[in-house]
Regions:
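Alpha-helical support elements that line or immediately flank enzyme active sites
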Residues: 34-49, 73-97, 135-138
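Alpha-helix capping and helix-loop boundary segments enriched in small/acidic/polar residues
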Residues: 25-28, 70-75, 87-94, 120-132
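Acidic/polar, glycine-enriched structural segments that form the non-catalytic walls/loops
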Residues: 1-71, 105, 113
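Residue-identity detector for glutamine
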Residues: 5-8, 84, 88, 109
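Amphipathic, alpha-helical segments enriched in basic
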Residues: 71, 75-78, 112, 116
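Helix-terminus loop motifs that line ligand-binding clefts
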Residues: 55-59, 63-65, 94-136
Length: 138
């Protein structure tokens, strides 16, 4: 594939994702603002596996992803449990399921008895108050 083909495929994939919500009315500028905000809600949590399904687990060992969900990373719990995750639960429940299963897998692999508040590249950042991951499960 050449660059133009890859660009076209990426445009089509993003348009498919962004069209999960369709709006009417408003100016072109307002629509641009809305869909830019939608795009920002879809950047993370991102896929964490390599092309062969392997990833570094919560125990810092190499694991192969389970085929029942897509292993994801970057859960900034305090920032997203009241906004991004309720929205994604409605428009993309598979993504939310993937992230919650990823947090469970990380806790199981690491032996920790809690879900990470701000998981970053399958590591514990140890910051933020409370445990917003629990609110995302409910």
């Amino acid at each position: 594939k050449n660059f133009g083909q890859v660009k076209q495929e990426a445009t089509e994939l993003w348009n498919k994702e962004l069209n999960r919500v369709r709006i009417s009315g408003g100016t072109d500028d307002e629509k641009t603002i809305f869909y830019t905000a939608m795009y920002h809600t879809m950047i993370d949590p991102r896929i964490y596996t390599d092309v062969d399904g392997r990833y570094v687990g919560g125990d810092y060992k190499i694991h192969t992803a389970d085929s029942t969900f897509t292993k994801r990373t970057i859960f900034s719990g305090w920032d997203v449990f009241r906004s991004q995750f309720p929205l994604q639960t409605i428009i993309n429940p598979r993504l939310v399921s993937d992230e919650l299963n990823s947090l469970i897998t990380m806790a199981d692999q690491s032996g920790r008895e809690y879900y990470e508040r701000w998981e970053l590249l399958n590591s514990y950042s140890g910051c933020m108050l409370g445990n917003p991951a629990l609110s995302s499960y409910v």
